[in-house]
A protein has these predicted regions:
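Terminal amphipathic alpha-helical/low-complexity segments used for targeting or macromolecular assembly
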Residues: 1-118, 177, 183-184, 189-202, ...
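Glycine-rich hexapeptide-repeat left-handed beta-helix
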Residues: 165-310
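Generic structural signal for beta-strand residues in well-ordered domains
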Residues: 43-45, 62, 78, 118, ...
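Short N-terminal secondary-structure initiator segments
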Residues: 7-29, 134-137, 143, 161, ...
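Short, charge-rich amphipathic segments
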Residues: 1-3, 24-40, 144-154, 169-173, ...
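Right-handed parallel beta-helix
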Residues: 110-171, 175
Length: 310
């Protein structure tokens, strides 16, 4: 992904050499005058972007050149010298410190009450008087926004949606025909941090939540935005009450998720998957198309297409 300028802005004219000093890099290798103009995940690296990597097996897959890579000594020999490498003990912590310096929220008036005059709202949309609609929000035709809803700056809601009472949406793109249940929170930062001797280092989340057309989200659900990429919910997904979808998750189209399910970070769920109540899925797991996870299943490894887990 690239930095979304509706939500974020990146510091200008920061070179690799500048950043090495900021994050306390022990060594720097390669072209140190590269000016950083974007943030990317490692697998989407492009020239002049900042990325990080701590796994030597993945480090050797880097394609391209002129990126700035926060990494460690183990990965260094595997990265093309046309990139600039900043060496730190913990690349993930170094990356967190780098983002804290480079990326800031785009300026917006968060003191808005009622409907901001800078919001774009279709004439046929219905907005409850107690709802808060911040600047740069877009609401499509026929959409209903109920009492107590808060739509933070930059949120986009398609046509014929229901955003039900007291839900809070930020860093979200919602397609047409969506139904967001009462009290749900979409687009908050995910549960990403590193524990150090000096305390907790929180990892910035600069991604979004992207929800396709005709998705139903139950009451009291939480869907966290992505850390670098997006959290993505496919079309026609049905999600029951009290579910948690963590950062960077992808849920395939037409999947059904019963109440109290928890999906950990960076999980990929295929199309047409069925999850019974209280299913828990561990991070980075892949669930194949059409798989069935029966109630209270704990999934810690990949599941093939069409398999059933009890």
């Amino acid at each position: 992904m690239s930095i979304n300028t509706v939500y974020y802005q990146i510091a200008k004219d920061v070179t690799a050499a500048d950043l090495a000093k900021i994050i306390g890099a022990t060594d720097l290798y390669g072209p140190d005058q590269i000016v950083i103009n974007d943030i990317e995940s490692f697998d989407a690296a492009k020239p002049f972007s900042l990325i990080y990597q701590s796994d030597p097996e993945l480090a050797k897959t880097l394609a391209g050149e002129s990126a700035v890579v926060i990494t460690n000594q183990a990965c260094l020999p595997l990265i093309d010298p046309a990139n600039c490498c900043l060496i730190v003990a913990s690349p993930r912590i170094g990356f967190a410190h780098a983002l804290a310096h480079l990326v800031t929220a785009a300026p917006v008036d968060h003191g808005t009450t009622g409907v901001s005059p800078m919001a774009e709202i279709a004439d046929t949309a219905t907005i409850h008087p107690s709802a808060t609609i911040m600047p740069q929000v877009v609401i499509g035709a026929g959409t209903v926004v109920e009492a107590g809803v808060i739509l933070h700056a930059g949120v986009k809601v398609g046509e014929d949606c229901y955003i039900r009472s007291n839900s809070v949406l930020s860093h979200c793109l919602i397609g047409n025909g969506g139904d967001i249940g009462a009290g749900s929170v979409l687009g908050a930062a995910g549960f990403g941090f590193e524990m150090t001797d000096d305390g907790v280092v929180k990892l910035p989340h600069i991604g979004l939540v992207v929800i396709d057309d005709f998705v139903s989200i139950g009451s009291g659900c939480a869907i966290d935005r992505g850390s670098l990429g997006n959290t993505h919910i496919g079309a026609h997904v049905m999600m029951d009450n009290l579910c948690h979808i963590a950062h960077n998750v992808t849920i395939g189209a037409r999947s059904i998720i019963a109440g109290q399910c928890g999906v950990s970070g960076s999980v990929t769920v295929g199309e047409g998957v069925v999850m019974g109540g209280q299913v828990g899925i561990a991070q980075h797991v892949k669930i194949g198309d059409g798989a069935v996870l029966t109630a209270r299943s704990g999934v810690t490894k990949d599941i093939e297409d069409g398999d059933q887990v009890a």
